[in-house]
UniProtKB/Swiss-Prot annotation:
Organism of provenance: Marchantia polymorpha (Common liverwort)
GO biological-process terms attached to the record: potassium ion export across plasma membrane; sodium ion transport
Primary role: Catalyzes the hydrolysis of ATP coupled with the export of sodium and potassium from the cell. Appears to export potassium more efficiently than sodium. May transport other cations such as lithium. Sodium/potassium efflux ATPases are involved in salt tolerance and maintaining the membrane potential across the plasma membrane in high salinity (Na+) or alkaline (K+) environments.
Protein name: Sodium/potassium exporting P-type ATPase 1
InterPro entries: ATPase_P-typ_cation-transptr_C, ATPase_P-typ_cation-transptr_N, ATPase_P-typ_cyto_dom_N, ATPase_P-typ_P_site, ATPase_P-typ_TM_dom_sf, ATPase_P-typ_transduc_dom_A_sf, HAD-like_sf, HAD_sf
Binding site for ATP: T332, E414, K467, R511, T575, G576, D577, R636, K642, N664
Family designation: Belongs to the cation transport ATPase (P-type) (TC 3.A.3) family. Type IID subfamily.
Catalytic activity: Na(+)(in) + ATP + H2O = Na(+)(out) + ADP + phosphate + H(+); K(+)(in) + ATP + H2O = K(+)(out) + ADP + phosphate + H(+)
Length: 951
């Protein structure tokens, strides 16, 4: 193989390209050589897409407001010769940065891996088989298969095209899609835009299908040469992260104000003791472990969702999911199984219908009318029946290798039609010797139909096969009667008859396709097929009949929709189906429900539960806004209608999730608050989304919403836990300014290292445990959260619990020093220089540190539920006390951690500025019990006074 990335491939013939690259257009590369080629040419990636930069992650650990305060405190401590405290602060910073770096780096790597899993894929032929691989695995020589909506994975020389058009705007600036060909382009100076036999990496297929040979990959592609990609290369901070960063800098400002207050109270004497007191206040303001805990919790949430088939591409989705009020879902493959089956056929003039048996993709089945079996050959003797089945097989791009083993490829609707043909031994392969494919007019949302043109070798004629929605009837002007084509005598009667049958089938929950065909002589076709416009081909068609396709709802869809309604989430179904088909499926899965106290399913509690796209789009924005409720179902939905639906929801201040899989769904996915792409959907849809569902299942969306709510609820829990502790510490230190020694210097009740020990060592583990708390039973039984992270109740809880802690700790301080002590605050007790003078103060510090640690550990159980008592199961009573093992161990071990700091010599006096205690333990126990009962009293007041849900 020659240098694959350096040849003028557009000037070579297909045979020359395959020879130069050592590949085969039918069988592709051998797997045995792929590894060697990957080593030779490297991964098919742009440099900007390569992983996570560890240096940026490390730098981020030192640039947030919380760490800045600790760095300043460290510098100040060393400046006043308090090396012990400065050393501890430096250790805390390094430890915190290390933990943060490891966890954030892992989180970024996880997100990077998930983005790659949801990144563009490529369908390649290797060793004669068709495989879907990740785009980075493509190598020069790979045979790539393209379909509408695909993002081209590499620069490719085309070898087969069917109506292929590509959007190259991001590469060439050409605003219109470019029609492609396979003929060699002569001329050395052909520009990228003139190389019509080439498709380029990152461009998008907008029409048709084809095959190509990968000739350049990675940075050797045209897009690589200009180092530009449509794929994302980075991940910006989420709104929550931005809010928390803002909070950090607000706290930084508060710490500066508090430092000024300390100096002002002490008449701006900048001696060592006063400076250390200011440092203590600065440290007390900061919940040091907050950012790391949030990062870890969100990373665990991403992994948990990935294990349940939901790949999170952007962290913002985790925050957005908890606020979702409306879900706009596709039907096919999402609410339903996606394994469509043809169950009904109808021919013009029939009073009954043909029923076709067989489940899913089984290629065996029987034909019956009114449950009476009919011989297949007898049916095929009717030219209308035979042509209808022939159209099902040939107006079709699906391939079936072994349906029973799931070896099928193509659109679910087309697979169903192909399976029908196989049941009657008329699959596409049976026509290969007689029918030569010429061109394809693919399905589009505008025409809502698809046609394929074949040349009948035996008859020297051309045949056009068409299938699609009801509007196919508009291009039909003939019927088959007794094997002869006749013009439709009465257009009105014809339309009325067929429309009535469509409605009957639609009410059975069937998707109905209209099937038609046309024969054109070779003489007429000699006008040059390639120049025929679609409008000229799809006319004067002969109507053959109707095909009814059943797409069985997933068993879990009804349960998931019920969960949404319990959670205050409205589900909308946006489908391309007929009005009555959509209505039948919507009732079956529970989207449309009978009015309360009504046994009649046709009576629903709203005036317009189902609208067609035409009806919805005919309304102005003002008329849509005047509707009491938006429709639950939109039938015959188009991508443009999806966008209008999202806009209408936004005008009503709703928070919407939207599903999609096609290239035309990208605008609505981007417009939605949460875009959810299907794993089997187009690459463009995936890149426009925040979440990709690998199982295409509606129940997975509901799981994701539940997980988003769980994560959001847990973040509120541990923020409440951490910040209320900080409030208590600040209260103690602010009021502590009033306690002055003989020199008039304020004596801090809590030393800086004590505060760091509480905030980092004993407070962070239970906060982490709260972050992984299991979802409560009412997670999906309350309306969506719309008040943000810091609602009024959360802020009130932070202040009340902080005030309770701070007040009890101050009482303990006063009791140890004044009630049972010598009432002396000593001299220079903010340092360890005068230990003999500071025994009482140091014992008081030990007492209040242990008491505060035990309070904050007990407070973790308070935070599990905002109002429920600890005596109840809901609030974490006996039945739930040990349900969160991480929390149990955090509390048990945390309660023992202060003991060594109190009793180990030198560590207690030199580092923690405290002393051993004895009888003071009784004060600790009493104050912790008091905190427990005061917390219960506060919750009791909330339960009796506040009747609304948590805000």
């Amino acid at each position: 193989m020659m240098g694959a990335n350096s040849t003028e491939w557009h000037g070579q013939s297909v045979e020359q390209v395959t020879e130069l690259l050592g590949t085969d257009v039918e069988r592709g590369l051998k797997e045995s050589v792929v590894g060697q080629l990957q080593k030779q040419f490297g991964p098919n990636e742009l440099k900007g897409q390569r992983g996570v930069n560890p240096w940026k992650v490390l730098l981020a650990q030192f640039t947030n407001g919380l760490t800045v305060i600790l760095l300043i405190a460290t510098v100040v401590s060393f400046a006043v010769q308090d090396h012990a405290e400065g050393g501890v602060l430096a250790f805390v910073i390094i430890f915190n940065a290390s933990v943060g770096f490891v966890q954030e780096y892992r989180a970024e790597k996880t997100m990077d891996a998930l983005r790659r899993m949801a990144s563009p894929t490529a369908k390649v032929i290797r060793d004669g088989g068709l495989d879907r691989i990740s785009s980075p695995g493509v190598v020069p020589g790979d045979i790539i298969v393209f379909e509408v909506g695909d993002v081209v994975p590499a620069d490719c020389r085309l070898i087969e095209v069917l109506n292929l058009e590509v959007d190259e705007a991001m590469l060439t600036g050409e605003s219109l899609p470019v029609a492609k060909t396979v003929e060699a382009i002569k001329g050395e100076n052909a520009t990228v835009g003139d190389r019509l036999n080439m498709v380029y990496s990152s461009t998008i297929l907008t029409k048709g299908r084809g095959k190509g040979i990968a000739v350049a990959t990675g940075m050797s592609t045209e897009i690589g040469k200009i180092t530009k990609s449509i794929s994302e290369t980075g991940q910006s901070s989420t709104p929550m992260q931005k809010r928390l960063n803002r909070m950090a800098y607000i706290l930084f400002g508060i710490s500066l104000v508090l430092a000024v207050i300390v100096f002002a109270v002490n008449k701006f004497e900048f001696n060592t003791d006063i400076i250390i007191y200011a440092v203590s206040l600065g440290i007390a303001v900061i919940p040091e472990g907050l950012i790391a805990v949030i990062t870890i919790v969100m990373a665990l949430g991403v992994r948990r969702m990935a294990s349940q088939q939901a790949l999170v591409r952007k962290l913002v989705a985790l925050e957005s999911l908890q606020a979702v009020t409306n879900i706009c879902s596709d039907k096919t493959g999402t609410l339903t199984q996606g394994k469509m089956t043809v169950t009904t056929l109808w021919l013009p003039g029939m009073e009954d219908q043909y029923s076709i048996s067989g489940n899913g993709w089984e290629t065996s089945g029987e034909i019956s009318v009114r449950e009476q079996p009919i011989d297949a050959q007898e049916c095929l003797s009717d030219l209308r029946f035979r042509l209808l089945v022939e159209c099902s097989a040939l107006c079709n791009t699906a391939n079936i290798v072994e349906a029973s083993e799931g070896k099928v490829w193509g659109d679910p609707t087309e697979i169903a039609l192909q399976v029908l043909a196989y049941k009657l031994q008329m699959g596409k392969p049976s026509f290969r010797s007689r029918k030569e494919p010429i061109t394809e007019y693919p399905f589009s949302s505008a025409e809502k139909r698809m046609s394929m043109l074949y040349r009948d070798v035996e008859r020297d004629a051309f045949e056009i096969y068409t299938k699609g929605a009801e509007n196919v009837l508009a291009i039909c002007d003939r019927l088959l009667e007794k094997g002869e084509e006749v013009e439709i005598s009465s257009r009105d009667e014809f339309m009325q008859s067929v429309s009535a049958q469509i409605q009957i089938m639609a009410k059975q929950g069937l998707r109905v396709l209209v099937v038609a065909y046309r024969t054109v002589s070779e003489k007429e076709m000699a006008k040059s097929v390639s120049k025929w416009e679609r409008v000229d081909v799809e006319r004067n068609m002969t109507f053959l009949g109707l095909v009814g396709i059943r797409d069985t709802p997933r068993p879990e869809s009804r349960i998931a929709v019920d969960q949404c309604y319990e959670a205050g989430i409205i589900v909308h179904m946006l489908t391309g189906d007929h009005h009555d088909t959509a209505l039948a499926i919507a009732r079956e899965v529970g989207i449309i429900r009978p009015a309360p106290n009504s046994a009649d399913e046709s009576v629903v509690p709203m005036s317009n539960p189902v609208m067609t796209a035409a009806e919805f789009d005919a309304l102005s924005e003002e008329q849509i806004d005047d509707l009491n409720e938006l429709p639950l179902v939109i039938a015959r939905c188009t991508p443009a209608t999806k966008v209008r639906m999202i806009e209408a929801l936004h005008r009503r201040k709703k928070f919407a999730a939207m599903t999609g899989d096609g290239v035309n769904d990208a605008p609505s996915l981007k417009k939605a608050d949460v875009g959810i792409a299907m794993g089997a959907g187009s690459d463009v849809a995936k890149q426009s989304s925040e979440i990709v569902l690998t199982d295409n299942n509606f129940a997975t969306i509901v799981m994701a919403v539940s997980e988003g709510r769980r994560i959001f609820s847990n973040i509120r829990k541990f923020i409440l836990h951490l910040v209320s502790t900080n409030v208590g510490e600040v209260i103690v230190l602010i009021i502590g300014l009033a306690f002055k020694d003989r020199n008039g210097v304020s004596v801090f009740p809590l030393a800086p290292v004590q505060i760091l020990f509480m905030n980092m060592v004993t407070s962070t583990p239970p906060a982490m445990a709260l972050g992984v708390e299991a979802a409560s039973k009412d997670t999906m039984k309350v309306p969506p959260h719309t008040k943000g992270l810091f609602g009024k109740e959360v802020l009130a809880d932070m202040m009340v619990y902080g005030i309770i802690m701070g007040s009890l700790i101050l009482v303990d301080w006063v009791l140890v020093i004044y009630a049972f002590g010598d009432s002396q605050l000593g001299l220079e007790c903010n340092s360890d220089r005068m230990l003999n003078e500071c025994n009482t103060v140091f014992r008081a510090r030990s007492t209040i540190m242990v008491a505060l640690i035990w309070m904050l550990l007990l407070h973790a159980y308070n935070c599990r539920h905002p109002r429920a008592s600890l005596f109840t199961a809901e609030g974490g009573g006996a039945s739930k006390l040990f349900s969160n093992r991480l929390l149990v161990w955090s509390v048990l071990l945390g309660s023992l951690m202060p003991i060594p700091t109190v009793y180990i010599p030198t560590l207690n006096t030199k580092i923690f500025k405290q002393e051993t205690i004895s009888w003071e333990w009784s004060i600790v126990v009493v104050s912790v019990v008091a905190f427990f009962f005061l917390s219960e009293l506060y919750k009791l007041i909330k339960r009796n006074v506040m009747t609304s849900r948590v805000i």
